[in-house]
């Protein structure tokens, strides 16, 4: 196998979610995160964009989405891209 870089968009449950605390919770529970930033969406809502490196296993995308769904304050997780590292 190899490694893949995954770009994710994390949507909080509401505009009232403390994004700094949510980022800290994500870093505490998920390994392999290379970059994380807040991106304004509109109407007072922001998303968290994450770049992470993980093993290229079958079903890796589903595993990643499942991992983030267990963190309180997250409404949904979208994988924007998944690319194999050379």
Swiss-Prot record:
Gene3D superfamilies: 3.30.70.60. GO terms for molecular function: translation elongation factor activity. Signal peptide: none annotated. InterPro entries: eEF-1beta-like_sf, EF1B_bsu/dsu_GNE, Transl_elong_EF1B/ribsomal_bS6, Transl_elong_EF1B_B_arc. Keywords: Elongation factor, Protein biosynthesis. Belongs to the EF-1-beta/EF-1-delta family. PANTHER family: ELONGATION FACTOR 1-BETA. NCBIfam families: aEF-1_beta, PRK00435.1. Promotes the exchange of GDP for GTP in EF-1-alpha/GDP, thus allowing the regeneration of EF-1-alpha/GTP that could then be used to form the ternary complex EF-1-alpha/GTP/AAtRNA. This is Elongation factor 1-beta. It comes from Methanocorpusculum labreanum (strain ATCC 43576 / DSM 4855 / Z).
